[in-house]
Amino acid sequence: FGAIALGWFWLGLLFLALNRLADGLDGAVARATVMTERGGFLDIAFDFLFYALVPLGFAIADPAQNALPACILICSFVGTGSSFLAFAITAEKQGLSTQAQGKKSFYYLEGLTEGTETIACFVLMCAFPSWFPVLALIYAALCFITTGMRIHRGWTTL
């Protein structure tokens, strides 16, 4: 976040890669040893914070060009995140489970825009920071579609 906010996009890209490496390792360690509720909670909480901080960094780096697209992107992340978590909570209450996305600490509802796609978009944003507004708006549209898909899936499944 800080590197991106300061306009050091390549350093931001390095930190982004390190963050994703750490995120992947913590999940692998949990699956190889013991998965805990605390670990699952921290994993999802830090992921959603991370997803909001990257666009915020771009908004701070160039408010005139990036602030509105960053706000729209963050709003779209609220949609994907809230529909994802609302489904997981309700599925848990109803005793539903799946391992379609691998072994997870909660019901993992797939979507058009997931972690891999988000990271790919963030990589493009860091590599081509002048494209941020267009990339943010395109990705936000895809996230809003994902939100709609998840709401529909929740409505028809639960």
Where are these regions (language model features)?
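Membrane-interface alpha-helices at helix entry/exit sites of multi-pass transporters
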Residues: 40-43
